Amino acid sequence: MPGIDKTDRAMTSVTAQEALDFHSQGRPGKLEISPTKPMATQRDLSLAYSPGVAVPVKAIADDPATAYDYTARGNMVAVISNGTAILGLGNLGALASKPVMEGKAVLFKRFADVDSIDLEVDTENVDEFVNCVRFLGPSFGGINLEDIKAPDCFIIEQRLREVMDIPVFHDDQHGTAIIAAAGLVNALTLTGRDFKTAKLVCNGAGAAAIACIELIKAMGFNPENIILCDTKGVIYKGRTDGMNQWKSAHAVETDRRTLAEALDGADVFFGLSAKGALSADMVRSMGARPIIFAMANPDPEITPEEVALIRDDAIVATGRSDYPNQVNNVLGFPYIFRGALDVRASTINDAMKIAAAEALANLAKEDVPDDVAAAYQGNRPRFGPQYIIPVPFDPRLISAIPMAVAKAAMETGVARKPIEDLKAYGQQLSARRDPIASTLQRIVERVRRQPKRIVFAEGEEVQMMRSAIAYANQQLGTALLLGREEVMRETAEREGIDLDRAGIQIVNARLSKRVGAYTDFLYSRLQRKGYLFRDVQRLINTDRNHFAASMVALGDADGMVTGLTRNYSTALEDVRRCIDPKPGHRVIGVSIALCRGRTVLVADTAVHDMPTSEELADIAEEAAGLAKRLGYVPRVAMLAYSTFGHPSGERSERVREAVKILDRRRVDFEYDGEMAADVALNARVMEQYPFCRLSGTANVLVMPAFHSASISTKMLQELGGSTVIGPLLVGLDKSVQIASMSAKDSDLVNLAAIAAYNAGT
């Protein structure tokens, strides 16, 4: 399908085993269900189930609309498929489609905080499918149909919309259409054209193509200026071969019979067909400043590079993330459902689709503020031929599109719960962002533009090998695997790992021509610290961390990752023998904790055991600096067991003094303390202290000691269901990251990407 970029170029280098491992590691699959109410006591159970549950049951029986108040229905979308048109794989059946549907469900959650469950219906009979889905209506606030073959998808969607009172949306059709329409609006603006006069040719007559044509017609595009083509050529009035009612609805009077003839003098090409369908001669025959949307996946009808060789005046969009102007369904469906659910819409009508397309188009025209520029790797985009569609990780999407959809639903009378305070609604939407996922994606994209050489110090470990390969496969740079080649190759053969692929380089310390330089370098640092020359020789020849850190220190690598075989403090001691702190900075560890959509940075989780007041102030500055680099506006809480002097104690005084030091330094970020964790993180509790200088709940927590920082983050991870990244090492003069000994492959790849990112900033 031309929407969600499930098979883009950056992902084609993922190995089959990596994909299987990703889906099978830990709990198999990509979804789980977590309770939103406490289940700790007998009373909790009595409220959640019998006898307490009888009360909302009776309320819903008396007034069905209250189901939205007492159940999860109002934020629940079902992703439903029969697997008859899976990605580019075809009809592989309902069960085989489950990984795709789980993936779609997690995209709903990731991008718009919509809860979603996948349902695979094992039938190709349209009547059976419709009956199955229609009777599930009470369970959900909306239905997202996915990967259903044409023309069944048209029939199924239409019939379900007629019999259900909740939104039913076939994303393969309408998602692609909405994003393509948004891009078309902007491309026409840039080329001085409009919907009334532009001439468009669409190649492909499947679900997405038909939906694209229908939507732009609804937006005012002149039907007489649209020619639809399929594998048999132009769909013209009177044609009978290979026709159906959906194609016939868009047949036109024309004497043109082939795609090449149709494109002669055309302004716009919509491709929803196959690789190579658009030839160089066809591109040459198009009008001035042609608009080419080559949306076939995984390979477009023609690539931007191929177009550039033919002419330099074209605006090009594809379905791929490695080119500008990506037509990606994830720009649409999460936010469209978000807006529809929030007003309890009974359907998603044309007005709501058009509103989504226009909001997306307008977003690309707006000036990009500083906090949003980070989503574009610091390269602030400007409306133009290379930027007619925002990228999926633009944080403004969650605010702009649901708002437009909700307004359209209210204006057209399909909203059963109109929003009274739109300003407050906008703030609620912004609060649903998942910033750290966006941050990691921004880091990856930035590194792809400036690839780095990263040393994976424990190269003989299977996890390091797999992580190095993943780093190279994601086109982040060269992965330098440090270790004995014969040992690594023996392990790689046993584990089915290919070490000969591009982007992997094996470095054997004993055989390196740089051993002498590294030894001299390290000896110059350690000779007055009790080390003999032979001691340093031994470290360089036999100790992976010292060798790797020396590589980084002398510029033979941009960064390093280590930690699997030694505890954090030992690994850090190794590194610090070779690399100093940045001038004027303090080395600390910062962990990033994600829990229920909130992101909090916690420091110091790695270095300082019982920091002094001066050190606590330094830690606050370093952590706030990292928060800024990651795209956050820091609000720093200096934590203690007491809050603003009560109860008093010697250890709290140390934290209070740190706040005074920050006052004297006149730092440029919000901070306050000392305060307990509930005051820092709970807005209602914070309101009891109106003098608190934080403008909102804290997103940077400075702990009073290492033990409290380490214990709290590990408890969050193990008991609180949080995702914890780090500790990230901050303050060194060179880029080094140290993993925990229990780190997973994905953790190591993230740390390598962060090391590469820091090396370039």
From Swiss-Prot:
Q: Quick check: keyword Repeat in the entry?
A: no
Specify where the region named Malic enzyme lies, as residue ranges: 1-437
Transmembrane intervals: none
Cofactor dependence is on: Mg(2+); Mn(2+)
Q: Which UniProt keywords apply?
A: Metal-binding, Multifunctional enzyme, NADP, Oxidoreductase
Q: Which InterPro entries does the record match to this protein?
A: Aminoacid_DH-like_N_sf (IPR046346), Malate_Decarboxylase (IPR051674), Malic_enzyme_CS (IPR015884), Malic_N_dom (IPR012301), Malic_N_dom_sf (IPR037062), Malic_NAD-bd (IPR012302), Malic_NAD-bd_bact_type (IPR045213), ME_PTA (IPR012188)
Keyword match Transferase: no
Q: How does it assemble?
A: Homooctamer.
List the GO biological process terms: malate metabolic process
EC id: 1.1.1.40
Note how many cofactor molecules are bound and how: Divalent metal cations. Prefers magnesium or manganese.
Q: Which residues form the active site?
A: Y49, K104
- Residues given in the record as a divalent metal cation binding sites: E146, D147, D172
Question: Which CDD domains does the record cross-reference, listed alphabetically?
Answer: NAD_bind_2_malic_enz
What reaction does this catalyse? (S)-malate + NADP(+) = pyruvate + CO2 + NADPH; oxaloacetate + H(+) = pyruvate + CO2
Fetch the PROSITE patterns from UniProt: MALIC_ENZYMES
User: Source gene?
Assistant: tme
Question: Which positions are annotated as binding NADP(+)?
Answer: A205, G206, A207, A208, N297, N329
Q: List the disulfide bonds.
A: none
The record's Pfam families line, in alphabetical order, gives: malic, Malic_M, PTA_PTB
Annotated region Phosphate acetyltransferase: where?
438-761
Q: Which family does it belong to?
A: In the N-terminal section; belongs to the malic enzymes family. In the C-terminal section; belongs to the phosphate acetyltransferase and butyryltransferase family.
Q: Which GO terms describe its molecular function?
A: acyltransferase activity; malate dehydrogenase (decarboxylating) (NADP+) activity; metal ion binding; NAD binding; oxaloacetate decarboxylase activity
What name does UniProt use for this protein? Answer: NADP-dependent malic enzyme
